[in-house]
Amino acid sequence: WEQVLRTNTLSPLKIAATFAKNLAAGRQKKLVTISSIMGSITQSDRGSDYIYRSSKAAVNMVMRNFSADTLGRDLIVAIFHPGWVKTDMGGSGAAITPSESVTSLRKCIADLTRADTGKYFNFDGTPIDW
């Protein structure tokens, strides 16, 4: 559990804290974290996967709070679920290919505005309830 929390929760926070100042000084001013819909408490309708789910719920909270801490830095902080992707983890029955996920995410990230900071989105840009 500890290793998963380090990877999925603590590492994104350390990366965000390390690069926030440089990102805010740059042209894009966007910091995006890839989470999972499995980290949504309101979307959770089944048991299992406790370690993964809790680590993604934790990174959602961490990045939501980080977005509040960086409001004065002109930095857009957003969280995305990449979709159910055909990968080793998602399996062959998943809904979309990695290419489809990335193409959609790139468009959504490009379209982010200051009004989106601190929000949680699906790969297609629709908001996800916490």
State each model region's role.
Residues 72, 79-80, 91-130:
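C-terminal helical subdomain
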Residues 40, 86, 127-129:
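Flexible, glycine-rich phosphate/dinucleotide-binding loops
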Residues 1-6, 10-14, 20-71:
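Catalytic loop of short-chain dehydrogenase/reductase
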Residues 34-36, 82, 123:
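Active-site loop/turn elements of alpha/beta-hydrolase fold enzymes
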Residues 50, 80-81:
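Acidic/histidine-enriched, beta-strand-rich ligand/metal-binding domains
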Residues 82-88:
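Short, flexible catalytic-loop segment of classical short-chain dehydrogenase/reductase
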Residues 43, 89-91:
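A short local structural element in Rossmann-fold oxidoreductases
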